[in-house]
Amino acid sequence: MTAPVTRAAPEPLAERRIALVDLLDRLLAGGVVLTGDLTLSIADVDLVRVDLKALISSVGEDVPSPWEPLREVRP
């Protein structure tokens, strides 16, 4: 019979430190989908409703920008 293996608990996510630049690089490399709903109401009457659906990803040669490049404006 084998002896039970005890493993240390992994570090909590709050204790891990990561630079913002590294986080953005990881997120943009694979892409991020954001969705959300916001409703502003007074006395149970909905006044404003906002639905957010966004896809955020990096632009490269494989996935070109959908907008034309900006032209230089000379004074």
From Swiss-Prot:
Keywords associated with the record: Gas vesicle
Annotated compartments: Gas vesicle
Residues annotated as transmembrane: none
Main location: other
Domain of life: Bacteria
Record GO terms (molecular function): structural molecule activity
Keyword field contains Repeat: no
A single Gene Ontology CC term: vesicle membrane
Signal peptide (residue range): none
Record's note on what induces expression: Gas vesicle production is induced by growth conditions that promote production of secondary metabolites tiancimycin A and B.
PANTHER family: GAS VESICLE PROTEIN A1, GAS VESICLE STRUCTURAL PROTEIN 2-RELATED
Described function: Probably a minor component of the gas vesicle. Gas vesicles are hollow, gas filled proteinaceous nanostructures found in some microorganisms. It is not clear what function gas vesicles perform in soil bacteria.
Family from the record: Belongs to the gas vesicle GvpA family.
Extra information: This strain probably produces some gas vesicles from the probable gvpO-gvpA-gvpF-gvpG-gvpJ-gvpL-gvpS-gvpK operon; it can be induced to produce more under certain growth conditions.
Protein name (Swiss-Prot/TrEMBL): Gas vesicle protein S
